[in-house]
Amino acid sequence: MAEAVVSFGVEKLWELLSRESARLNGIDEQVDGLKRQLGRLQSLLKDADAKKNETERVRNFLEDVKDIVYDADDIIESFLLNELRGKEKGIKKQVRTLACFLVDRRKFASDIEGITKRISEVIVGMQSLGIQHIADGGGRSLSLQERQREIRQTFSRNSESDLVGLDQSVEELVDHLVENDSVQVVSVSGMGGIGKTTLARQVFHHDIVRRHFDGFSWVCVSQQFTRKDVWQRILQDLRPYDEGIIQMDEYTLQGELFELLESGRYLLVLDDVWKEEDWDRIKAVFPHKRGWKMLLTSRNEGLGLHADPTCFAFRPRILTPEQSWKLFERIVSSRRDKTEFKVDEAMGKEMVTYCGGLPLAVKVLGGLLAKKHTVLEWKRVHSNIVTHIVGKSGLSDDNSNSVYRVLSLSYEDLPMQLKHCFFYLAHFPEDYKIDVKILFNYWVAEGIITPFHDGSTIQDTGESYLEELVRRNMVVVEESYLTSRIEYCQMHDMMREVCLSKAKEENFIRVVKVPTTTSTTINAQSPCRSRRLVLHSGNALHMLGHKDNKKARSVLIFGVEEKFWKPRGFQCLPLLRVLDLSYVQFEGGKLPSSIGDLIHLRFLSLYEAGVSHLPSSLGNLKLLLCLNLGVADRLLVHVPNVLKEMQELRYLRLPRSMPAKTKLELGDLVNLESLTNFSTKHGSVTDLLRMTKLSVLNVIFSGECTFETLLLSLRELRNLETLSFHDFQKVSVANHGGELLVLDFIHLKDLTLSMHLPRFPDQYRFPPHLAHIWLIGCRMEEDPMPILEKLLHLKSVYLSSGAFLGRRMVCSKGGFPQLLALKMSYKKELVEWRVEEGSMPCLRTLTIDNCKKLKQLPDGLKYVTCLKELKIERMKREWTERLVIGGEDYYKVQHIPSVQFINCDH
């Protein structure tokens, strides 16, 4: 539906003109003329979209409109930015600046007239083809934010309620993995959308499976995988604390993984393996010795038998009509108000038949219709399905058009802003886990969402849009069970195909995978019309210097190889809003000074990049909203004192290491919502006083000021939700300092203290809603548990690296009433831990790591009946012997579904 996409751009342009009307004073006639033509154009778009399939000329006109809107936006913003820069050049250049000002205004007026003329020509052309004006329907519709407030009252992201007909299949697969010693490989094969990954995930997390195996790994094998990456991810899952894995070459990885799999019982899941050749590329690490087991999912039915002739090959059945209806009804009814009209069962069942028994299609259709509140709306969807889908049931891999159409319907039903949010997911590679915080910053940087007008944060606004896509079953999400906030999202590969197809159809994105020439394009898309460029290979970095990209608005890079890039500069990308250079290794460690020419930039990331020198021209980027300077930790980074110019910043991550003489003035960054790696050595703590919008703050305390002064500088930060203190010089904090630390932060939920804190504050000094606390290297002499267990809202506690130096720790009856996760790591002096009956009644996960003097698990652990997962890491072999079936302490853990021993002494 191109009309919605084009209309969104037109509306954004109208907003820009209205918002900046005061600064455009003096050229009112040209601006008013442009706005009039935009209004006329808007009224033609709906009819043009309805007739776009009748003639290519209409489609071309719609593409012209998108180009015009982008060009107009670029022209207006460039003028406003250049005018602002002119005002800042000082008195000495006043006369020259005035002359330039007049010239710029005349040129801008001429450019606006040119845009208006182009719109007029499009309008005339459309009308010559019979395109008619259609007035807006009138009546106020709820904004997306208002609709989200309603949705959040009833919408649950719990996918368990969407599972139908899997119980028997899950039990069968579990039996073969756990009980059948003659089977080493189990495969689940079938067409896309039939539920292979869902089934595998249920098996992977099954209580019996978690209990049986010593370790687990889940790796998605995309069509563009590398052998090294797959081996690396498996080994990282099985040895999570081995930091050396990232540096291993293929030969070392192969040897380490082969030896590890020979030594224990491990379950490996390779999800979405496409070809037999893919298996052949990675199979060298899997020993013939029994013990480890493999669960494969693939569309290729013969893959499992190719991997292992004794493989148990399982093919999920499509849902029966009854199961399809049950799943559909469950989704629709769980997301609707009970007072709404009764679902027309006959009409609903007919629509469900077009899903061909595929769970994905049923869930997407259910998510679509759950939002339709009237019989008329249901009839419209029904009519759309009947009109466009031929054939009612029975699908094969060669005949999935009807399923594709069902998935497309959900896209077509999206509001126009959500279409852009959905399109943006096309940037990411297949099976990619998308960090939603980064995704939200992309959306904001491109103006797709605008969180700032009502005081909401980027995170809150982004979540409301993403939840709409989740509710429609267009994306799947991974959320923290501790915070219930979404952390990652992904698309099913069939939905991704829809997303890519629609995004390319609208010229929204150009994807470059492995180019062979500097002019490589995909699907013959015009580089001038695709304003977003995504590189899925580091070998394509040279394309950033290509002249065809001069109108690009975003550049994202994935799959960066370990080699240096020598950029020619960024002159060919003058209109960029988003530039993500994460993991890119710059030759010589220098970011080119031409980065300062990208004056439209809103998002810049150098996360884990090989950069050690930043140019002073960075200060030209006055529109930046997100700046991530979290380069590779090993690098000492020269940062010029120009960040103070970026007064629109909402997110700032500073490098961990900077030269001793570096001083940064940050006091004017009053819009910051998140500030990471703020060092008292390189910045003044008084700069924090005015950052009252901060919700996330990470401070590195290095002794240049007193801790009391630091705390006083934080007193106005009433919106803080996450606060971290890191004292790497181990300066002991006075007792009253610890009390002041948390006294006033009434909204604080997450607290990290990595510092000497010999005396712990009492529970009355902690904020009322504190949910998560990390204590690292605090060297407390008294047991902190009597205080921590009285914090009624605590959900997670992490004690690490000498947080407590005592020998005995006690968790009392009634303590920690809401605690879900407890981790104790590197408590080298702890000998005895006692848990009383009635303590930690809700605990779900417990990790004991490298507490070598701890004699045994507490007897009271047998009373913690909610415990689902126990991890014993880097402990003595005696622990394993005592806790396995038949062991001396087995009775303490026999109720826990998953007990894992990781890197324990052999």
UniProtKB/Swiss-Prot annotation:
Organism superkingdom: Eukaryota
Any one Pfam family match given in the protein's UniProt record, by short name: LRR_14
Repeat region (LRR), residues: 573-597, 598-621, 623-644, 646-671, 672-696, 704-727, 740-766, 767-790, 791-818, 840-865
GO molecular function, one term: ADP binding
Binding site for ATP: 190-197
GO biological process per UniProt: defense response to other organism
Family: Belongs to the disease resistance NB-LRR family. RPP8/HRT subfamily.
Protein name from the UniProt record: Probable disease resistance RPP8-like protein 2
Taxonomic source organism: Arabidopsis thaliana
